[in-house]
Structure formats: C-alpha cells, structure tokens
Amino acid sequence: MLDGARKLLLDEYYGNREIVAVSPHYAAYADEKYRHSLQVLGAGNFIIRHEPWFAGLGEEFVDLAKTAVLLHDIARFDEIRERFLGAKGPFDHSVAGGEKLRKIPLYGDVRITLPIKHHGHLIGDFYKDEEYCAIADPVLKEEVEKILFLIRDADKIANFNLMMYDQKMLVPLFVPYPEEVSDKRRRISAGVLEDFWRHQPVDRRKIRTRADEMLGYVSWIYDLNYGSSAAFCLRLNLVDMMFDVLQRFHDDSGLNGKMRRETGDFVRERFGFSPLPQS
C-alpha cells in the first residue's frame, strides 16, 4: 500500500506542477509540499519506532498508518492548481484530501480517510464527527484516533523543523522578516495569550499581529499527543529555537522567558519522558 501511495503522491505532484510551472511562486509551493509530505513521513516513522502503542501491531497496520501519514496533504496539489487558476474561495485541504482518497478503493479505509479529513482541524471537530462517533468497534475507533494523532504530531514536527532550520522558508511561508514589521505588529493580543496560558493551541481567529502568529506556532506544542514527539522536538532544540525567533517579533524578554518556562514545564508534566536512545 505504501509503495502505491508514493506513486500516487508523485502523480499528483507532477501532474499539478506541470500546470503551475509558469509561476515561480506556485511551482515552488508545489515543490515544498512534496518535500513536506516526505518529511512528515520521516517524522511519522520515528514516532512509530519509539511509541509503545505501535509495537507489535503488525506490518500491515504499520503500512496503512504510514500511508495515511504520507498522503495527509494529498489535496494540497489540487489547492495549488486551483489558486493558480484564480480560485478565491476557501479550500479545506484536510476535508478535500479525505474525500479524494475515499473515492480510491485502495485508500478508502476509514483509518486513512478520517484522520486525513481532520488532521488540520481543532481536535474537538474530530471527536464530534458523525462518522467517527458511529464507529461501533472500539478497536477500530482507537486505531482511527491513534493514526490521527500520528499525522498531527508528525506534521507539526516537520513544520517546526522547516521553520527553524530553513529560515528562507520561514519568511515566505510563515511570517515576514521582523525588520519589516511595525511596532504595532509586535504585540501579543490578549486572546492569544489567554489560549497560551490555558495550554491550548491558539485559535487562529484571534491572531491579529505577527507576534500572535509566531506564538500560535509555539502553542502547537500543547497539541502534541505522543511523548516521543515531544522528545524529538526537544532533541532538535526546536522549542527553544522558536522562542528565540519569537523574541525577534516580540521584544519582551521577561514575558518571553516566562512563556518559555511554561512550555518546558508543560512537556515535563504531561509526558514525563526521559531522553530517547540515539538511533
């Protein structure tokens, strides 16, 4: 199944990139989304290797889980094509991806389609999904949930890594250079801070400033599900690096230091992990 998924991903990437190739912006965006899919699979492989829940589940299940991870952004290429062609309305790539795969028998398993449908949504939307709620088999229901957690964690790790280790991508894909941001865009809004102190991902509807935007990315740490995911982030020093970037947007070392300590305490209290063995 995973080999077929790799071919499907390539077909979607090449087919849509050919259409947008005349636009450097959209062509680069398609290139990045293909790379991102591979990076998310790499992060997912790490989680599967180190997370106890996945141990002993069998090669077939692991292959299915990896397929869901690899194809999580399969509808991004449709979105890029449609934006290039002039579409202006909203495009939910999570929902579109789930529906796209539902029409392909090989990938129509609910353990693939439902996690992809909700990987970019607030977790509460998933738990209220009628299809998820209607699953009677508790084992199947847990597998759907665990694969969703896997995709969400691997996706965050890949984005954290991109933002922190590829600064040229931080600028066009996430936020502009701090030097281009006026003082009024450096403030953190009250509603954003409220979400942060509640240990929940920042509601994007509350974001008003570039500092809000960056703290919103930091707050993703609150949405990690697996201890191995948190350990991976800390091993690469991603959390500290994100706060270093936040300092460039929000010049308040006292508050930034307090928030940095808060996330560290949260990770220790929630996961209580010891460093993972090198592998």
Label each region the model flagged.
Residues 9-39, 75-86:
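Active-site flanking loop/helix segments enriched in acidic
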Residues 88-95, 106-113, 140-144, 148-151:
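Short, amphipathic alpha-helical segments
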Residues 39-47, 90-105:
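An active-site-proximal "capping" alpha-helix that borders the catalytic cofactor pocket
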Residues 28-63, 71, 80-83, 127-128, ...:
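Divalent metal-dependent phosphate-bond-processing catalytic cores, especially two-metal-ion Mg2+/Mn2+ enzymes
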Residues 103-110, 118-129, 156-159, 163:
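Alpha-helix capping at helix-to-loop junctions
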Residues 60-89, 97, 101, 112-125:
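His-Asp-centered metal-binding catalytic motifs of divalent-metal-dependent phosphohydrolases/nucleases
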